[in-house]
């Protein structure tokens, strides 16, 4: 009877998950108790498959913070273990619960130990039985193999658990990176839209000022016209109400003046002639921005190098150049349009740099070969600015005239057989929707191309030279022209 009660108590304090006595028991809100390690492992599995924590027995949900240690059950388990380790209880374990005889035999069919009375019972009649000492080593070896197998499975299970955790961490990193990229892409979109909105509003304000200015002038003209008509009407009324002498005095002149009166209609502005707003092409803008981002990967550290005497001043850090007016009494004549070069020289690879030309009314920049190789002392102005003379440049003149300089091809050039000729360059007008404050220059030496980007306008291509023939090392080229505001080399972080 005591063993039956002991069995009932043992059943009450057995973990439903591992089927062993409770270890550090924790109780759920529903009242069921489990080993701390068992319910923790079950919590991970439950979250993985169901997305919430639930009791393994009744499936009622619970919160992990509501798990509470059950000290009462822990005390019962501790005392139960003490009782089970007592000699008299261990003796009861070694004896048959049904017959009270010592358990000395092993039934192969049932896989259990029995006493000699059990062997003779109808239940075990015809079964193969052996002394426990005879089969102990055999099953010890089997259990040892099973133990090694389970240990290996435990390692595999732990590895699988670690793999899942690693995959989970990897996914978290990947998702976070995707979030960062998405936020960056949409920020670029918002920046582009903000820039386009600002430009459209500025253009609209300019249009408004222009139209209203002309309408105000037209209104003033109409006021003067109305006043002139009123003066003539007053003169006619005075003559009609006066004497005959007043009526007929210079009457022919008055009639001729009236006949010449022609009302001028005010100037109007038709809506059809207005600039029509069109939503920006975001796909094209993103493609342009992507191209700019791609070439910016080849950002080169360029510094300005003083050349032959010129009308330019370079800053101490070699990042800025500006025009300086010549001193009148100097006898040395210097051709300012040669500008200055950037260092180092370029003989291969891809190179990119940006130049700040904010608020300048004139500038020229691009790429050229050594000034000593290109300088033609008999040429003045911009006639040297031609690819055949070793210049691949674009520029601004008079604050709004953007242009690129291409080689001119004249018959006399062919007859001369020389790279340096007196024929002026071919001027290619460049039309800007947004005037560039920053210009990006990208040189691909192997591809023989030089591209200019309007960084202010999200990287739209300004102009591109193709099939460039680089027979010498080439250099970045900068010419502030006669505008005293500086040209500044930009850093990648600016």
UniProtKB/Swiss-Prot annotation:
Q: Which Gene3D superfamilies match?
A: 2.60.120.920, Classic Zinc Finger, Zinc/RING finger domain, C3HC4 (zinc finger)
Any single GO molecular-function term of the entry would be: zinc ion binding
Q: Where are the zinc fingers (RING-type)?
A: 15-59
| Reactions mediated catalytically | S-ubiquitinyl-[E2 ubiquitin-conjugating enzyme]-L-cysteine + [acceptor protein]-L-lysine = [E2 ubiquitin-conjugating enzyme]-L-cysteine + N(6)-ubiquitinyl-[acceptor protein]-L-lysine
Domain B30.2/SPRY, by residue range, is 280-494
**What does its PTM field state?**
Degraded in a proteasome-independent fashion in the absence of viral infection but in a proteasome-dependent fashion following exposure to restriction sensitive virus. Autoubiquitinated in a RING finger- and UBE2D2-dependent manner. Monoubiquitinated by TRIM21. Deubiquitinated by Yersinia YopJ. Ubiquitination may not lead to proteasomal degradation.
EC nos: 2.3.2.27
- Positions of the UniProt region annotated as Required for interaction with GABARAP and for autophagy: 186-199
Positions binding Zn(2+) in this chain are 96, 99, 118, 124
User: From which residue to which does any coiled coil extend?
Assistant: 132-223
Q: Key word Transferase present in the record?
A: yes
Return the Pfam families for the record: SPRY, zf-B_box, zf-RING_UBOX
Q: Which GO terms describe its cellular component?
A: nucleus; P-body
Q: What does this protein do?
A: Capsid-specific restriction factor that prevents infection from non-host-adapted retroviruses. Blocks viral replication early in the life cycle, after viral entry but before reverse transcription. In addition to acting as a capsid-specific restriction factor, also acts as a pattern recognition receptor that activates innate immune signaling in response to the retroviral capsid lattice.
Q: What is known of its domains?
A: The B box-type zinc finger domain and the coiled-coil domain contribute to the higher and low order multimerization respectively which is essential for restriction activity. The coiled coil domain is important for higher order multimerization by promoting the initial dimerization.
- How does this protein assemble? Can form homodimers and homotrimers. In addition to lower-order dimerization, also exhibits a higher-order multimerization and both low- and high-order multimerizations are essential for its restriction activity. Interacts with BTBD1 and BTBD2. Interacts with PSMC4, PSMC5, PSMD7 and HSPA8/HSC70. Interacts (via B30.2/SPRY domain) with HSPA1A/B. Interacts with PSMC2, MAP3K7/TAK1, TAB2 and TAB3. Interacts with SQSTM1. Interacts with TRIM6 and TRIM34. Interacts with ULK1 (phosphorylated form), GABARAP, GABARAPL1, GABARAPL2, MAP1LC3A, MAP1LC3C and BECN1.
For this chain, the family text in UniProt reads: Belongs to the TRIM/RBCC family.
Task: Tell me what this protein is called.
Answer: Tripartite motif-containing protein 5
Q: What is the lineage of its organism?
A: Eukaryota, Metazoa, Chordata, Craniata, Vertebrata
């Amino acid at each position: 009877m005591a063993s039956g009660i002991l069995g009932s108590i043992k059943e009450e304090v057995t973990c439903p998950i591992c089927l062993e006595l409770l270890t550090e028991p924790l109780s759920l809100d529903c009242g069921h108790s489990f080993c701390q390690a068992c319910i923790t492992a079950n919590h991970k599995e439950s979250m993985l498959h169901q997305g919430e924590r639930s009791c393994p027995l009744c499936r009622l949900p619970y919160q992990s913070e509501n798990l509470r240690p059950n000290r009462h059950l822990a005390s019962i388990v501790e005392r139960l273990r003490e009782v089970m380790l007592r000699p008299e209880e261990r003796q009861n374990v070694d004896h048959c619960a049904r017959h009270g005889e010592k358990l000395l035999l092993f039934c192969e069919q049932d896989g259990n130990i029995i006493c000699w009375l059990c062997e003779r019972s109808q239940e075990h009649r015809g079964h193969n039985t052996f002394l426990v000492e005879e089969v102990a080593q055999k099953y010890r070896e089997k259990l040892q193999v099973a133990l090694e197998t389970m240990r290996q499975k435990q390692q595999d299970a732990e590895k699988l658990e670690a793999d899942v955790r690693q995959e989970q961490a990897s996914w978290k990193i990947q998702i976070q990176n995707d979030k960062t990229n998405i936020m960056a892409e949409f920020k670029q979109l918002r920046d582009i839209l903000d820039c386009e909105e600002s430009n459209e509003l500025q253009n609209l304000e300019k249009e408004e000022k222009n139209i209203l200015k002309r309408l105000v002038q037209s209104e003033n003209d109409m006021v003067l016209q109305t006043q002139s008509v009123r003066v003539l009407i007053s003169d006619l009324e005075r003559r009609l109400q006066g004497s005959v002498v007043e009526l007929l005095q210079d009457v022919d002149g008055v009639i001729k003046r009236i006949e010449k009166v022609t009302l001028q209609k005010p100037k109007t502005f038709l809506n059809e002639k207005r600039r029509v707003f069109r939503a920006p092409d975001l796909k094209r803008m993103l493609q342009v921005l992507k191209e700019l981002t791609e070439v910016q990967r080849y950002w080169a550290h360029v510094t300005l190098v003083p050349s032959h005497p010129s009308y330019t001043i370079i800053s101490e850090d070699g990042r800025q150049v500006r025009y300086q007016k010549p001193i009148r009494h100097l006898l040395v004549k210097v051709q300012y349009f040669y500008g200055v070069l950037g260092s180092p020289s370029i003989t291969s690879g891809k190179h990119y740099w940006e130049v700040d030309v904010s608020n300048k009314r004139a500038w020229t920049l691009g790429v050229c070969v050594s000034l000593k190789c290109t300088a033609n002392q008999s040429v003045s102005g911009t006639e040297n600015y031609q690819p055949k003379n070793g210049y691949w440049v674009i520029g601004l003149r008079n604050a709004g005239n953007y242009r690129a300089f291409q080689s001119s091809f004249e018959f006399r050039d062919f007859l001369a057989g020389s790279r340096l000729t007196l024929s002026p360059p071919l001027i290619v007008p460049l039309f800007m929707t947004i005037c560039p404050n920053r210009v990006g220059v990208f040189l691909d030496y192997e591809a023989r191309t030089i591209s200019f980007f309007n960084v202010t306008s999200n990287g739209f291509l300004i102009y591109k030279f193709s099939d460039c023939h680089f027979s010498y090392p080439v250099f970045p080229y900068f010419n502030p022209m006669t505008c005293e505001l500086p040209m500044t080399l930009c850093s990648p972080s600016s």
